[in-house]
Regions:
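Alpha-helical scaffolding within the catalytic cores
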Residues: 47-53, 82-86, 110-114, 183-186, ...
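Short, flexible/disordered intra-domain loops and linkers
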Residues: 26-28, 41, 74-76, 167-180
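Active-site environment of divalent metal-dependent phosphoester hydrolases
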Residues: 17-20, 71-74, 105-109, 163-167, ...
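Catalytic pocket-lining loop regions of alpha/beta-barrel enzymes
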Residues: 121-126, 135-250
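Mid-to-C-terminal alpha-helical segments outside catalytic/metal-binding sites
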Residues: 1-15, 19-58, 63, 245-250, ...
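Short aromatic-enriched loop/helix-cap "lid" or pocket-rim segments at secondary-structure transitions
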Residues: 20-26, 113, 169-172, 211-213, ...
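Active-site gating/metal-coordination segments in enzymes
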Residues: 62-65, 72-167, 295
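Conserved, mostly hydrophobic/aromatic
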Residues: 13, 85, 117, 150, ...
Length: 295
């Protein structure tokens, strides 16, 4: 139940606060965490499974969780991570909405693992697409089998757009080129797959105008805004959230780097009417979930 101080949240994108949840990531060791620590001003202090669940309850949040870097792993290790995530979800269904599945679509065993997750995973299961995987940008042929699996299952695909925190501030940016996160790839995937629900993840800066145009043009495109304080949203995004994008935007946090409590306070600072915030925090997500048949 929402209160004046703690609204009910459906968080369409956060990560794990547990050490196990960072297995396989570029930040698995303490030395590798310094760049991320500086970018988010987050101390990288981990919590237990139970502490994580309690933090979500305190925030009144139901969360879509993302490992992000499982595409780099051998398939047996990927399956172990997914089983860990699914066990956590089954023990804490009140705070876990579901999971974004990140795989390497060039590996047939990874594609089979996605198929298993879509079939057996608890809650909402969707595919997370990163352009820096071996398959390249999401409009490349290597992604087609996975996109079709999601379309057939009636489950969404998350395509990351805009500036990435991964590699930010490091020499060479960990080899990641930002062009691969241009909204043009959301536009292309949505056009080719009109029966596929495509969610653009993050604020799309420095291409926010293109992302707004894509969301307005394609009825199968939504936006979730994890990883950014609303204080720093581009001006045109701030304006359109209360206007033409009002029904197209989902709340996303990026826990544990950004806490739910901080983001709620900063959303409220922007001066949106209460009914607009209700749509962003829960209403739009509830309508979307009802449309795809997820409780």
């Amino acid at each position: 139940m929402s209160t004046d101080t703690t609204p009910r949240l459906i968080d369409f994108h956060s990560h794990w606060g547990t050490e196990r949840g960072w297995r396989g990531s570029p930040y698995e060791t303490a030395a590798d965490r310094e760049a991320l620590r500086g970018y988010f001003k987050w101390g990288m202090s981990f919590v237990s499974d139970e502490e994580q669940a309690e933090q979500f309850r305190t925030a009144n949040a139901r969360v879509m969780l993302d490992f992000a870097f499982t595409y780099t792993m051998e398939v047996g290790a990927v399956r172990e991570q997914h089983d860990y995530a699914f066990d956590f979800a089954r023990r804490h269904p009140d705070v876990v909405l579901g999971h974004w599945i990140g795989i390497d679509p060039t590996q047939p065993a990874h594609v089979k693992e996605l198929e298993r997750c879509l079939s057996d995973g608890p809650g909402l299961i969707g595919l997370a697409v990163h352009s820096f995987t071996p398959a390249g940008t999401p409009d490349e042929p290597g992604w087609e089998a996975c996109l079709n699996l999601c379309r057939e299952a009636g489950r969404p695909v998350l395509v990351h757009v805009g500036m990435s925190a991964t590699g930010a501030g490091t020499r060479g940016g960990m080899g990641i080129t930002l062009e691969g996160s241009h909204p043009r790839y959301v536009d292309r995937v949505a056009a080719r797959h009109p029966d596929l629900n495509v969610i653009a993840g993050r604020v799309a800066w420095p291409w926010q105008s293109e992302m707004i145009a894509t969301a307005l043009h394609k009825g199968n495109v939504w936006m979730e805004l994890h990883g950014w304080s609303p204080r720093y949203f581009p001006g045109e995004l701030k304006r359109e959230i209360g206007k033409r994008l009002r029904k197209r935007v989902f709340f996303g946090a990026d826990y544990p780097m950004l806490s739910h409590e901080r983001l709620v306070a900063e959303w409220r600072e922007q001066g949106y009417p209460a009914d607009v915030l209700d749509d962003v925090f829960t209403g739009n997500a509830e309508a979307f979930l009802a449309e795809i048949g997820v409780a």
